[in-house]
Amino acid sequence: MPAPILLTPGPLTTSATTRHAMQHDWGSWDAAFNQLTASVCADLVAIAHGGDEYVCVPMQGSGTFSVEAALGTLVPRDGVVLVPDNGAYCARILKILGRLGIDAIALPFGEDAAVDAAAVEAAFAREPRITHVALVHLETSAGILNPLDAIAAACRRHGKRLIVDAMSSFGALPIALADSGIDALISASGKCLEGVPGMGFAIVRRDALDASEGNSPSLALDLHDQYAYLRKTGQWRFTPPTHVIAALRAALDQYLAEGGQPARGARYADNCRTLVESMRALGFVPFLDASVQAPVIVTFHAPDHPAYDFRRFYDAVRGAGFILYPGKLTRLETFRVGCIGAIDAGDIRRAVAAIGAAVESLGIAMQPA
């Protein structure tokens, strides 16, 4: 039986070429593997348009490991971090800062509202002690896109440092670090680059990284030490996820051959457009307004029907070969459908047909939205 298609924001469906790259074993101290790491890091900085101002620090583990590493390394103990909060991944940053003992100020927004740059500036006026902003660029709990450029500009005007969780946007949406004033951008292998999970990375401004020595309370999650060792030896400090990096190298080769960010973003946008139009034809209503919807994952209102049960619905769609994501909102019954991975609009149309059949199997009659 073929593997199901993952309609999730990561892990996601990968190409056969990417999976095949993991068939080779690598020595973690071998020169060939060191060259592999260096080539991956160079491409990641180039994709971010970082130029010579920025370096890539790879980190073992999920993307959250790298988010915690960046916060723990780049924010000094007496720093104060403003966290615009419009979803679960913003809340996770607040939890990380709490565990690190770093003072944090939450700036709440609705789950269906993008962060407002003017509200961020107003927070600077109310709380002049703020030193940093930690922004989730694409809040995947709903699929909402936050205005990175406007917030980066506000931070520059007020002399605040900006750390960006670009976990679900990097590689698909345009981001240019050069002259942005952003201290760090964090993402991971298993998202829009279409690698496999297991490696995060921070693309960090050199001067911010140089100034961070001794900040981190963690040995393993110290970005400064990780990069210093990598620069000195070409090696990771601790055992690297060798097969993950090999898969990412293959995924990056395919990414560049496809046409880089513009082409990857266009394919995902086509997937998203096809998904929303086809789901509306079935009767499903997107949670977000189109003006703030990112082309990565779409949240839909669940059917308002007593026969609806997410587990039975999920199992029926899973049986047809597609894996969905549960909702992650606090106040509404929803589910999510991803638009990313090694998939195209044809896969999306087949998935929507499976969703329609699943709803029908539950005895739910829907009308076009």
UniProtKB/Swiss-Prot annotation:
Q: Which reaction does this chain catalyze?
A: (2-aminoethyl)phosphonate + pyruvate = phosphonoacetaldehyde + L-alanine
Q: Name one GO biological process term.
A: organic phosphonate catabolic process
For the modification N6-(pyridoxal phosphate)lysine, the affected residues are: 191
Instruction: Please state the Enzyme Commission number of this protein.
Output: 2.6.1.37
Q: Which GO terms describe its molecular function?
A: 2-aminoethylphosphonate-pyruvate transaminase activity
Enzyme group, top EC level? transferase
**Which keywords, in A-to-Z order, does the entry hold?**
Aminotransferase, Pyridoxal phosphate, Pyruvate, Transferase
Domain of life, source organism: Bacteria
> What task does this protein carry out?
Involved in phosphonate degradation.
Q: Which NCBIfam families match?
A: PhnW-AepZ, PRK13479.1, transamin_PhnW
Q: How does it assemble?
A: Homodimer.
This one is known as 2-aminoethylphosphonate--pyruvate transaminase
- Lineage summary: Bacteria, Pseudomonadati, Pseudomonadota, Betaproteobacteria, Burkholderiales
